């Protein structure tokens, strides 16, 4: 072969290798996007930036390897990249590492990422919540692990596995981290596991008392990985759940694990561990926050959640400011549903009960909504937006046509995102890739984001102190 023929062959082989690599990267990129958005929606968008005849079927065949490899155009590639979340501004220079357990849609994560943290592990079982999480939070494939079932990591559903083996497995599969975040579910502690382990001569302590609950999984990870700091979140009723037994087991466990819990002795009406979201946004939403410091680091002195008031906004947004100017009519209650809720509230009011809808006047700058719940998708009754319904006319002539035009409406998912603090009215939109029903569940199960942004700011100097203390220990070793 001549010199140029050899060159041509070499260039061809190089081009084919580059093309193959690009096709593999394009397929990987598409796969990441399809973990969040449905195929039909993505195909529609791709058709708008090029001449390729994309469809749900062509995407499905490509991603499943049932057709010849494809190469995206530059416009198509850019579109798909824009559909994924951007890395935080401080990437890749992170100040500390954290993990996000029972993550939901990332409400606790945001504050800790904002102060310079890197999320290296996320666990969330609900696949629809995972879609929303992945739509909004950057997850570096090289540094981050996603888990759908925490029990697969802790082996808590395999009682036959010896404890030492379980801890070794956790240590291998959960990345090292400085801060552990967890919004675990509230569950009663059963004595069944205790008696079984006693009969087997197994260890006492939290390994017995907390078995069978998802808090047990959190405790196992804390014991195995020994993070410097943890932040646990739960409903306010955790303190009184099961006549206080649940909370006692949790606090005893955290003490057994070697942690000082901030404000642990405070249990009364003004317990600083119970934080109401109304201080940050116009929604009454009380949550208990447990902040723990590893005892051997001796860094907990001076920390109290009472100081969170330092981060209250000077001017809390009013309820009306969070609303969209124009919404789809589907969010207005139907005459039948409004009549049902109206009569239901009247019936219980007559009995002296407080059950009923929560009507919020958006014109009143002091209005505070009730707690948004995961069942909001059913009827929206806990937070209804007043659209000018005349109560007096409603009492005498409920079917009055003019008054019926002012039936209340429920919040839109976008307004829920604002009420929970996932987005600001003039800020970057929070991406909602799921149905209204799913989004209502997700926001109703979440936390008021600014509360945990404030907790993160309060903790920032302690986290940096912990990182420094841990690194000094490693150097001495």
UniProtKB/Swiss-Prot annotation:
Catalysis performed (reactions): a 2'-deoxycytidine in DNA + S-adenosyl-L-methionine = a 5-methyl-2'-deoxycytidine in DNA + S-adenosyl-L-homocysteine + H(+)
InterPro entries per UniProt: C5-Methyltransferase, C5_DNA_meth_AS, C5_MeTfrase, C5_meth_CS, DNA_meth_N, SAM-dependent_MTases_sf
Transmembrane helix recorded as keyword: no
Single biological process term from Gene Ontology: negative regulation of gene expression via chromosomal CpG island methylation
Domain of life per record: Bacteria
The entry's keywords: DNA-binding, Methyltransferase, Plasmid, Restriction system, S-adenosyl-L-methionine, Transferase
Keyword S-adenosyl-L-methionine: yes
Residues annotated as catalytic: 186
GO MF annotation, one: DNA binding
EC number: 2.1.1.37
Domain spans labelled SAM-dependent MTase C5-type: 96-466
Subunit structure: Monomer.
Annotated protein name in UniProt: Type II methyltransferase M.EcoRII
The species this protein was found in: Escherichia coli
Gene: ecoRIIM
């Amino acid at each position: 072969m001549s010199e140029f023929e050899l060159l041509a062959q070499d260039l061809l082989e190089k081009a084919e290798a580059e093309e193959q690599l690009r096709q593999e990267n394009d397929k990987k990129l598409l796969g990441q996007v399809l973990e969040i958005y449905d195929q039909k929606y993505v195909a529609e968008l791709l058709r708008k930036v090029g001449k390729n005849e994309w469809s749900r079927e062509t995407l499905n065949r490509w991603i499943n390897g049932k057709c010849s490899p494809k190469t995206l155009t530059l416009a198509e590639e850019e579109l798909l990249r824009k559909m994924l979340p951007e890395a935080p501004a401080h990437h890749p220079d992170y100040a500390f590492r954290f993990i996000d357990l029972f993550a939901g849609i990332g409400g606790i994560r945001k504050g800790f990422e904002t102060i310079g943290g890197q999320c290296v592990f996320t666990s969330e079982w609900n696949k629809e919540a995972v879609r929303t999480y992945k739509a909004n939070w950057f997850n570096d494939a090289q540094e981050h692990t996603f888990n759908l079932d925490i029990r697969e990591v802790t082996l808590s559903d395999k009682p036959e596995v010896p404890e030492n083996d379980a801890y070794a497995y956790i240590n291998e599969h959960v990345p090292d981290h400085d801060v552990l975040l967890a919004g675990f579910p509230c569950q009663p502690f059963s004595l069944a596991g205790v008696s079984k382990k006693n009969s087997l001569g197994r260890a006492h302590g939290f390994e017995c008392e907390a078995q069978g609950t998802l808090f047990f999984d959190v405790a196992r990870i804390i014991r195995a990985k020994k993070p410097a700091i943890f932040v646990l979140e739960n409903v306010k009723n955790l303190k009184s759940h099961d006549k206080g037994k649940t909370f006692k087991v949790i606090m005893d466990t955290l003490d057994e694990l070697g942690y000082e819990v901030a404000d642990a002795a405070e249990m009364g009406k003004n317990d600083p561990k119970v934080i109401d979201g109304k201080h940050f946004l116009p929604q009454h939403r009380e949550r208990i926050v447990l902040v723990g410091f590893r005892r051997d680091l001796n860094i907990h002195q001076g920390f109290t959640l009472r100081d969170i008031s330092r981060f209250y906004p000077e001017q809390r947004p009013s309820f009306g400011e969070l609303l969209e100017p124009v919404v789809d009519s589907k969010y207005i209650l139907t005459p039948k549903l409004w009549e049902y809720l109206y009569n239901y509230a009247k019936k219980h009011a007559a009995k002296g009960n407080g059950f009923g809808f929560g009507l919020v006047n958006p014109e009143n700058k002091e209005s505070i909504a009730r707690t948004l719940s995961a069942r909001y998708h059913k009827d929206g009754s806990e937070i209804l937006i007043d659209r000018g319904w005349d109560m007096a006319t409603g009492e005498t002539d409920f079917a009055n046509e003019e008054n019926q035009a002012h039936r209340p409406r429920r919040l839109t998912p976008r307004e829920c995102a604002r009420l929970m603090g996932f987005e600001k009215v003039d800020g970057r939109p929070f991406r909602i890739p799921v149905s209204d029903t799913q989004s209502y569940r997700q926001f109703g199960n979440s936390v008021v984001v600014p509360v945990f942004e404030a907790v993160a700011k309060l903790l920032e100097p302690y986290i940096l102190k912990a990182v420094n203390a841990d690194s000094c220990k490693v150097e001495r070793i």
